[in-house]
Amino acid sequence: MSAPQSATPSSLAQSLHFWARNASNESALLRTSLRLGLFDALPVEGEGTPVKVDALAAKVGASVRGVRSLVELLVCLKLVHMDEALGLSLTRPVASFLKDAAFRQKLQETARWWGAIGHLEEAVKSGEPVTSEGQRWDVLEYYRELFLETVPGPTPEAKDFFDRFARSAARTWLLVTAGRLGLLEQLATGPKDEAALRAATGASERGLRTVLEVLAHLGLTQTEGATSSFTEEARQVLDGKALPYLLRSFSVSAQYWEALDRLEETVRHERFILDLKDPEVSQRFYADNSNQITAVFASHFQLSRRAAATIAQVRPLAGASVLDIGTGSGVWGVAFARTEPTAHVTYFDQEVVLAQARRNVEQLKALGQARFWPGNLFTQDFGEAAYDFIILPQVLNVLRPESLPDMFRRVARALKPDGILVIAEYVLNERRDGPLDHLYFGFRRFLTNEGDLLSHSEYAALLSDVGLTATVCLPLPTQELLLAARSGVTLPTQLAPPPRAAA
């Protein structure tokens, strides 16, 4: 979960992936849980009666949905225990170190720095303290103390907790800042002396040295005299297209920073700081997100091609009419088009997103099979008995839970009687305490006033209500493939081989 102090090439790649996607979520989770009083409201494991989520929410004065989004992650991280009856208690090691007054005070002091960390770029350029919330903060000195000095903790578990609580988000914002300054791109071209880096990035002497020292601590850079470069491990990991993709990932994560800072407000009152139900916010956010998805189009294309091949095992795609709802980059619809040249694919999304999808479809020579349909996911009537296959590629997680029945009703109506609904989604286990990456993804959906992730049985119940009584859930790399149809329609029970193996 938290990044190691030094990394081999493979673990450095994993660490960078975590810092780009979930490190700030981890810090915000722990920071908010402490500020809510959630840890204090839980009985210690084995010393009291476990409490359910709704009772815990009432105890801390927060929404049930908000508290659940925190608790499911805390259980997965093994900081909170959940018994077979779904009762919750605080694990003994956590209860022990949170009783340490000095350690707890250190956590509370660290929690105050979130807003100031967001001004790191300004601090690097000026070399001076920055103003945040009417106060002056020496962010550069804070980074030096946080990463380059030893922070005492009463137990190894406490030190690990502090690392997640304080350093995870700080790592993310350091790399956001290094990306915005152009520092990482400068180092990617080869060793650079300090004067050249300052000239290229606009950094002050103090600011640049602080950033380079912390990057070195993370295993990314090395300095000899006045010359800095990527470490060999970092050079290998960030070679080719990896660095541009990483920078785009950090750009997406940066959009959540203020919302994570004010997460307590959202958990208590469901007051959403980054509200993707706001049309203007949504349009801007998803336009950027479609560009990010396009950056990993090749890997997503492998997944979607495998899904199309899986369905083709039991149902011919020849002449099929396919609707790709919330198409994003267009990768799922294109997979069906490329699997069967006679299939006709309709790509449905916001107009601003379809512009990028059209470019991708054209690039993969599937434009002749394509139709582009701009519209509103939340209200659109998709027709009646019009499609052999309807694809929902990571779309359901943007819908609030109360919106899912209507969505499934509209989709089921649009399916032909023997049609198949294809859902690509992060599906939770039946206890809703994993997988970890899925839970972090769901955490961000709550943060932005979107939807919940569900288990297979939860999806199956909703689909059965609209007549899609047959379901299977197959594991793809990174996500799940959920297929649904009416009774009597044959569904595949195992994945087709990966495209290369199939060839």
Regions found by a protein language model. Name each.
Residues S2-E84, P93, A101, P156-T223, ...:
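Alpha-helical subdomain
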Residues F18-S33, D40, R68-A195, A199-A200, ...:
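Conserved Class I S-adenosyl-L-methionine-dependent methyltransferase catalytic core
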